[in-house]
Amino acid sequence: MSSIRRRHAAASLDTPAVGGRHELGQNFLVDRGVCTRIAEVVSSTTAHPVLELGAGDGAITRALVAANLPVTALELDPRRVRRLQRTFADGVTVVHGDMLRYDFGPYPHHVVSTVPFSITTPLLRRLIGQRFWHTAVLLVQWEVARKRAGVGGTTMLTAASWPWYEFTLVERVPKTSFDPVPSVDGGILVIERRSAPLLDDRCVGDYQNLVREVYTGPGRGLAAILRTRLPGREVDAWLRRERVDPAALPRDLKAGHWASLYRLYREVGTRPAPAGRSVRARPGSVGPDRSLPPRGLRSGPPRARRRGGGA
């Protein structure tokens, strides 16, 4: 049994039974083909145990087991925890817990989850704040999957972690693949920790301040936005060098652009300002931003209110 599974094998089930699917915000994946596809994506990565967040009735769990993957299945509903324990007597460690509070543990692993649509953003923030997972395969709302993968424009949350993570959109999942049927389709999103980060971990705080400044700064287009913080000649030279349209928006930048822009800020001696303040750079003075999620790669996320699992 793997370390991550041994660590949580004895979970308490004394918590009273909570409500049904609606109360937990659950839409269970019932399409076996999609479950198999998720297991295939995980199997194609490095060999690590799998932590499944919100195992529900075990549809994805079953596909992971069929792919010979060691699984720790986390579920909030005690009734479903007991059902999972009966169904998977061997090969799966079933844990009762909340995915927004669960300690992932200091062991290399992959993460799989059909994320309850109502807690997608909190879960992504928490996930980015955990250090030891390698690949996360998540089933989220279709539009969220597209935005996080930078299709049609990148969100601030993705840009804030892009130098350290890669985001890939795998495929669209019809809403009829869920029970009960939600109002929107889902999408399989893969997040992988970069083996060679574009920036050092020590840059996290200042880099995230930069991302916030650029996304929320005044001006129309990147040229105008960046000139509020950098000399015009430096801005023009950077735009030409990176082949970025001066009228482009922050959402149009790619991971390499963001890393290059951060280096430019450091080179010209301008430190991105924490929330609402403008300060000059001091050698070695970097720290995690307290206002922009994720909160950094070196520390965990803030405590979250208790919400349901899903599968």
UniProtKB/Swiss-Prot annotation:
Alphabetized SUPFAM superfamilies for the sequence: S-adenosyl-L-methionine-dependent methyltransferases
Sequence ranges of Low complexity compositional bias: 293-302
GO annotation, biological process: response to antibiotic
UniProt EC number: 2.1.1.-
GO cellular component terms listed in the entry, alphabetical order: cytosol
Single annotated GO MF: RNA binding
Signal peptide stretch: none
SMART domains: rADc
Superkingdom, taxonomy of origin: Bacteria
Record keyword S-adenosyl-L-methionine present: yes
Region feature (Disordered): 272-311
Intrachain S-S bonds: none
InterPro entries: KsgA/Erm, rRNA_Ade_Mease_Trfase_CS, rRNA_Ade_methylase_Trfase_N, SAM-dependent_MTases_sf
Keywords, sorted A to Z: Antibiotic resistance, Methyltransferase, RNA-binding, S-adenosyl-L-methionine, Transferase
Binding site for S-adenosyl-L-methionine: N27, L29, G54, E75, D98
Role of this protein: Confers resistance to macrolide, lincosamide and streptogramin B antibiotics.
PANTHER family for this protein: DIMETHYLADENOSINE TRANSFERASE, DIMETHYLADENOSINE TRANSFERASE-RELATED
Similarity comment: Belongs to the class I-like SAM-binding methyltransferase superfamily. rRNA adenine N(6)-methyltransferase family.
Protein name as it appears in the record: Mycinamicin-resistance protein MyrB
